[in-house]
């Protein structure tokens, strides 16, 4: 599913004022790159990225105003092409008449922002990159546990939703159940959220669908969370050798990002919520430089070398 972003979306989500070119507010923005047409103001348009959103700051505007009226009209007409999604003018600067005329003629929206140029670029870039980020969906449950985004996966019926319910009761926050939408917003960052249709909902076999926010309050849910850890729940297999020390760390690749993964076997009597809670705390401990498994291994090796073990 490819996101469609239009100039109208910028008006809806940011403190922008439409100055002219209203006919083009439904133009599609196809890239997260933003162009500052500095060299174009001199008349050099050979490599003009006309498909990008254009941003005019104080420097570009000062140069533009130093041009003659005829030159300003020429630059404005060449800036406003049939595929340019819009021109944003920062710092609340007045829009020259030549630019307004070219905007109305070509249908390129001119948007005015009261913010500084750097702030405008930063916010627009972050917004567009999140919209155009690579996207996938995974069957599982995403929970925020002590600030760690834990993605719980496993075959259907293994107890993912029931475990998430117990985690919510223990004070943690549900992000998504059953279907987790994941976007790669950076080279090493995965952000998960719930589809709007099932946001805040949990499906519990025997009970049906429950609204977590209604039952437990607004503090029991959040709209999105960065995924840091994967917990794979699987039915206990007597023939399989499970990790008992934690020295070897499995990884799971989601799009271009590798995430640490722990496999937790399921059988009666095991408190999965507590185990996953501890896994999240242990993950935080590792990020702070404390690895209990490695410390135990080093302690054991030292005792063996000293001959303290018989």
Swiss-Prot record:
InterPro entries: HPr(Ser)_kin/Pase (IPR003755), Hpr_kin/Pase_C (IPR011104), Hpr_kin/Pase_Hpr_N (IPR011126), P-loop_NTPase (IPR027417), Ser_kin/Pase_Hpr-like_N_sf (IPR028979). Its cofactor is Mg(2+). The active site is at residues 139, 160, 178, 244. Its EC number is 2.7.11.-, 2.7.4.-. Mg(2+) binds at residues 161, 203. One of its GO terms (biological process) is regulation of carbohydrate metabolic process. Residues 265-270 are annotated as: Important for the catalytic mechanism of dephosphorylation. ATP binds at residues 154-161. It catalyses: [HPr protein]-L-serine + ATP = [HPr protein]-O-phospho-L-serine + ADP + H(+); [HPr protein]-O-phospho-L-serine + phosphate + H(+) = [HPr protein]-L-serine + diphosphate. Residues 202-211 are annotated as: Important for the catalytic mechanism of both phosphorylation and dephosphorylation. GO terms for molecular function: ATP binding; magnesium ion binding; phosphorelay sensor kinase activity; protein serine/threonine kinase activity; protein serine/threonine/tyrosine kinase activity. It comes from the Bacteria. Keywords: ATP-binding, Carbohydrate metabolism, Kinase, Magnesium, Metal-binding, Multifunctional enzyme, Nucleotide-binding, Serine/threonine-protein kinase, Transferase. Homohexamer. Belongs to the HPrK/P family. The Walker A ATP-binding motif also binds Pi and PPi. HAMAP family: HPr_kinase. Both phosphorylation and phosphorolysis are carried out by the same active site and suggest a common mechanism for both reactions. NCBIfam families: hpr-ser. Catalyzes the ATP- as well as the pyrophosphate-dependent phosphorylation of a specific serine residue in HPr, a phosphocarrier protein of the phosphoenolpyruvate-dependent sugar phosphotransferase system (PTS). HprK/P also catalyzes the pyrophosphate-producing, inorganic phosphate-dependent dephosphorylation (phosphorolysis) of seryl-phosphorylated HPr (P-Ser-HPr). This is HPr kinase/phosphorylase 1.
